[in-house]
Amino acid sequence: MIRDSGEIFAGTVIKVERTDPAPTSTIVTQITFRVEEAIRGVRRGQIVQIREWAGLWQAGEQYRVGEHVFLFLYPPSKLGLTSPVGGPSGRLQMDDAHKIRLKPVASHRAQTIRLKDFAAALRRAAKE
């Protein structure tokens, strides 16, 4: 997942807009984030805009203003579009206390990890 990511960061959604493309273009949703923790391809405090194919939104991949997320994003395509690596696996929810909700695999209870601890573990893994 780390290897396939062009950008890895924790951030807050500050704007969501659907672009009005030319008639022959792909419909795109543009999401703007404020980076809170930068791992790869961005800087802390940076305002980052990504463009996703609007079809992801119909499949349930939606963002809300004020939402805190941790993202593993593919490098932008030739069209400038990106998406989370591994689909939903590349997008983790974060609460207001900056704890990341880990998706349960074997148990029914989601566990959390502090953003700082998760970021440190990712940085170590990226060096290996």
Features from the language model and the residues they span:
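Transition segments tied to proteolytic processing and entry into folded domains
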Residues: 1-128
